[in-house]
């Protein structure tokens, strides 16, 4: 079978399975399995594919049709300028979280040697993205999951970036002080599990769901962060657009200066806060 015909059939299979971007996913999987970059893939469309390679390709296509995340099948994702290994040990880094990285860098642009804490680091994406962008920063990252931390450490070694990883809940007993505490915590209401996309079910529940209103992790995180920031230091959180305004209002009631920032689609996804008077 020629490569272009395999792409056509693979795209049709993923379309029938309801995969949101069937042609793109089929091409990326074939490139991965065959070890081709985009240019080589285009140039070799008329070449015959051997039976072993075709069998490997169909194995990946069928797993994607079963809604295994693309990143778990390719084993990697490019995020925030850093190449990361991605598998079932941690949440697949989302494109929208790159705006949280942007907001963090904006917050730190005037700090000469910032101390930063990433709470609930998962793959290590945020911590490593920050360290890559600000090499002089002292970056620490925590996670409750030892499996996620093992993946984050692998990604740090892969990228050659020096980040300190600590296993534990929220701030894990760290007192700081930090110029910035940043987190993409679990923020989905537990009821969302019943209607989650098939791909999401391959992510750890621990990284996704946080009680009835999705704020069971963010609220105690705020409480711990208050004493761990330098004067004028900031807390940056990614939340669900349904609950970000709620947490911002609670922060203001508790004496924080807090605002909700939109993502690139205009949805109220991020909360930026600092202690009043900071």
Swiss-Prot record:
What's the catalysed reaction?
L-glutaminyl-[peptide chain release factor] + S-adenosyl-L-methionine = N(5)-methyl-L-glutaminyl-[peptide chain release factor] + S-adenosyl-L-homocysteine + H(+)
Looking up Gene3D superfamilies in the UniProt record yields: DNA helicase RuvA subunit, C-terminal domain (1.10.8.10), Vaccinia Virus protein VP39 (3.40.50.150)
A Gene Ontology molecular function term of the record:
nucleic acid binding
Annotated residues for binding of S-adenosyl-L-methionine: 120-124, 143, 184
UniProt key word Lipid biosynthesis: no
Domain of life (superkingdom)? Bacteria
Which Enzyme Commission number(s) are on file for it? 2.1.1.297
Q: Which residues bind substrate?
A: 184-187
Instruction: Tell me which Gene Ontology terms the entry assigns under biological process.
Output: methylation; translational termination
Kindly state which keywords UniProt assigns to this record, in alphabetical order: Methyltransferase, S-adenosyl-L-methionine, Transferase
Instruction: Name the InterPro entries for this protein.
Output: DNA_methylase_N6_adenine_CS, HemK-like, N5-glutamine_MTase, PrmC_N, RF_methyltr_PrmC, SAM-dependent_MTases_sf, Small_mtfrase_dom
Role, per record: Methylates the class 1 translation termination release factors RF1/PrfA and RF2/PrfB on the glutamine residue of the universally conserved GGQ motif.
**Similarity remark:** Belongs to the protein N5-glutamine methyltransferase family. PrmC subfamily.
Q: Which NCBIfam families match?
A: hemK_fam, RF_mod_PrmC
Q: Any idea what this protein is called? A: Release factor glutamine methyltransferase
């Amino acid at each position: 079978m020629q490569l272009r015909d395999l792409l056509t059939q693979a795209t049709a299979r993923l379309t029938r399975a309801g995969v949101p971007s069937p042609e793109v996913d089929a091409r990326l999987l074939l490139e991965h399995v065959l070890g081709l970059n985009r240019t080589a893939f285009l140039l070799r469309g008329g070449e015959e594919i051997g039976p072993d390679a075709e069998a490997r390709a169909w194995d990946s296509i069928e797993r994607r049709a079963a809604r295994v995340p693309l990143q778990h099948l390719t084993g990697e994702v490019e995020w925030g300028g850093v190449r990361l290994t991605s598998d079932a040990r941690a949440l697949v880094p989302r494109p929208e979280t790159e705006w949280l990285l942007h907001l963090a860098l904006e917050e730190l642009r005037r700090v000469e040697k910032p101390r930063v804490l990433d709470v609930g680091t998962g793959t290590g994406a945020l911590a490593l993205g920050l360290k890559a962008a600000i090499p002089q920063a002292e970056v620490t990252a925590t996670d409750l999951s030892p499996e996620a931390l093992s993946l984050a450490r692998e990604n740090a070694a892969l990228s050659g970036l020096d980040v300190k990883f600590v296993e534990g809940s929220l701030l894990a007993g760290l007192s700081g002080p930090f110029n910035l505490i940043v987190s993409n915590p679990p923020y989905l209401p537990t009821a969302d599990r019943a209607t989650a996309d098939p791909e999401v079910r391959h992510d750890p529940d621990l990284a996704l769901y946080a009680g009835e209103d999705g704020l069971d992790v963010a609220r105690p995180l705020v409480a711990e962060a208050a004493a761990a920031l330098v004067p004028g230091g900031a807390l940056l959180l990614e939340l669900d657009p349904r609950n970000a305004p709620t947490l911002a209002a609670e922060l203001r009631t508790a004496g924080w200066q807090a605002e909700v920032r939109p993502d690139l689609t205009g949805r109220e996804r991020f909360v930026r806060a600092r202690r009043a008077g900071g």
